Amino acid sequence: MKVTAVSSVLLTVAALTNANEIDKRSFFGDLFSGLTGSKAAAPAAAPAAQPAAQPTTQSPADQPTVQSPVSSDQPSTAQPVAQNNLLLDSSNSTLVVPSSSKSSTTTRSTAGLLDNLLGGSGATSSEASSSEAPSSEAPSSEAPSSEAPSSEAPSSEAPSSSSSEALSSSSTTKRPTAAAKGFFGDLFGTQSSASETDDEDCVEETESPTSAPASAPTTSKVATTTGGGLPNILSDLFPGKSSAPISSAESSPTVASSTTGFPNILSDLFPGKSSVPSSSAETSTTVASNTTTSGGGFPNILSDLFPGKSSVPSSSAEEDDEECEDPTESVTSNSSPTGGISIPTFPITSQSKTSVSSVVSKSTSEDDDDETECETDIPTIIPSGSVLPTTSVLPTIIPTGSGSITILPTKSATSDDDDDETDCETDIPTIVPTESATIIPTGSGSVTIIPTGSGSITVLPTKSATSDDDDDETDCETDIPTIIPTGTATIKPTGSGSITVLPTKSTTTDDDDDETDCETEIPTIHPTVSTTRTFTSDGVPTTQTLTTKLPPTTNQHTETEVVSITYTGGGQTFTTYLTQSGEICDETVTLTITTTCPSTTVAPGGQIYTTTVTVITTHTVYPDDWEDDGYEGEDNAGGSASGSSDDGEWEWYEEDDGECVPTGGSSSGSGTGSWWGSGAGSSGGTTSGSGSGSSSNSGASSGGTWGGSGNDYVCPGEEGYDDEEPDNGGSWWGGSGSGSSSGSSSGVSSGDSGSSSVTGGSSGSWWGGSGNDYVCPGEDGYDDEDDQTPEPECDDEDDSWDDDEECDTQAAKEVVNSVTVAAESVYPSTTAASLTTSWISTQTAQSVTQIENIGGKVSASGLFVVLGLLLI
């Protein structure tokens, strides 16, 4: 074993402390010896009572170790031979207890400071132990060591011989050697590991240091460890644990081996289990282990700070015949550290929790039938939400939220149980809802619709208590409550544009078959209900027709209902013409609006109606040739007009004065007041005139009626007629510039052929154009026209728009901006459903209601655009 020794500032302290054990030398001699290492090694005198032993001859620190044979009766115990090493580290002296039959000799040499810093060949200590010595005379050795294992555990550089050789032969000498790592090696510590061989079957100990079991209970082991160097100076001040494994015999007196080192300072402050396991050899005797273990080395600092299980498992070889104990717990069970305070370890027991499963028993509410009732499907309920049965006779429905349906069907005590024996009742209640609904029965044969939210429809059909019970015994009643209204639907308008549908079921429809009708095809009657409703909106009579058609039923669980909405003025598809004076820029705008409501699904149980509204919108522009009046030959009027346009060529121009205001009605609001809709605003009142119809216009508009965002548009000959580009980049064709109409628009425009309802919100011109040229179809553009001075304003007698009469003829001619329809349903909280859908345009505050059928959910996607003919 190589011993490291380093001089330090504590040399004088060590010299004063160990003055009685060393020869007196000078301070500089000790310093020189500490720097260069001891070159002379003299064997220490053996104790007087010790027999003559053959000491182990050892070369200086820088020479290989040569050892002489050791007799089997005289094991050698190493003692320091260099006195200056004792000066450097007084605690590293080996104390040999005299024995009557044992002798120990220790040979040690030390290395210098440089060797210790950089590592080199240090001293070697060897020992030989005999297995024949009585355990009562085993000497105790107190030689600290930071790296060296005991005589029974060789270091990592010297593999041990087989354990059987160590047990049977008394003359076998183990020479554990370890190369010194130097100061840095001592600072970070080293760990040795070697495989061991046990006599037993426990082979899990191959990772731990070797442990040689003793062959006899009386065998004693003398553990000799060495240490020194700078790590030992501080560790001498703070005695700690050994970082090397310790081998002890459990039947012999306790052999305490303690090693100190710099890495063990924190270990001493926080005692814990050894990071390098000790190795103990236990016999089958019941001697408790009192092995003192300790750890060290830089890797062990954290483990010493937080005491826990050893990072390297300890190993012990037990000769028990019964079973192999856990080797990692046999050594550290009764271990006590050399310094610090021991922290006991308490076992932590875990508790397991058992879960108790609940068993729901079968309900006994279905046992009302006495003998032969089938009851195969009671209750065959397939709702999308929760079903909570109650004891009331009529179904009670409680809405639980959007998209959910709560159906509480119960079995009537008088209606379902009248058939005592043969009523199968296989479908009570066969409810397959497809939408969320709140169903509240209102009485025999009546239906109440209570909507539960936006877009939801609630139908509450009930079956009369007398209608189901007419068939006393043999009615299977497979359709209860498979109820689809087949009687007359009573449609009662409840307000402006709202329709309340309260369908009722005739009590004689289902009950004509008294006994044998299982009612598998009920209802098969599909009446067509048409209701015409006329109301006045802003003084304009409006007629709306609701048509309900029930197609043939192919399945008793699904039924389709078609709802068509018709506006007067041309039937289901209507056209309204708005006509202006034919002298200037005749233009016909034809708009077709088709509104259909197909695919109304009825679920028999939940009575859910889903209606899809399809809106088809088309418009066509027919520009006629502009007459030459006021266009050609107008060069002498206030300058030259375009003059280059002949028949078949016409243009649109801008007007800045805004004097051509219709006189047939009143205009109010911001902007220029022009019913055309100027950039700053639009007409904010009602404009009516002597045209072929009337128009209600009110509201706000962020642009012109045409969707442009700038000035009014004038025909040729008016002031402002030139080749200038529009100052706003907009166009009545729907320029993509700023100021396009935004918001919602609705209104009723009454033309020659009827009335129209325009609803919805608009963003952008409904013409959809994006150019700056105001050219009617068929023209190539007017940018290449000569720059002409336009005609003066409307007060010119020769102009086509020269007086109020001319402007007056165009009083009620307006095209409302295009709108995008998004159906919005507003439901009151009454029992009678008020299904109302409103759209508001930018040009009017008129609210038009979309009529809905029973359970009709109106969802529109498309454009509602005013239809008409515009003459400009």
UniProtKB/Swiss-Prot annotation:
InterPro entries per record: DUF3246
Primary location group: secreted
Lipid group attachment sites (GPI-anchor amidated alanine): A845
Propeptide: 846-872
Record PTM: The GPI-anchor is attached to the protein in the endoplasmic reticulum and serves to target the protein to the cell surface. There, the glucosamine-inositol phospholipid moiety is cleaved off and the GPI-modified mannoprotein is covalently attached via its lipidless GPI glycan remnant to the 1,6-beta-glucan of the outer cell wall layer.
A Pfam family recorded for this sequence: DUF3246
Keyword entries, A-Z: Cell wall, Glycoprotein, GPI-anchor, Lipoprotein, Membrane, Secreted, Signal, Virulence
GO cellular component: extracellular region; side of membrane
UniProt family annotation: Belongs to the HYR1/IFF family.
Name of the protein in its database record: Probable GPI-anchored adhesin-like protein PGA25
Species the sequence originates in: Candida albicans (strain SC5314 / ATCC MYA-2876)
Lineage: Eukaryota, Fungi, Dikarya, Ascomycota, Saccharomycotina
Gene that produces this protein: PGA25
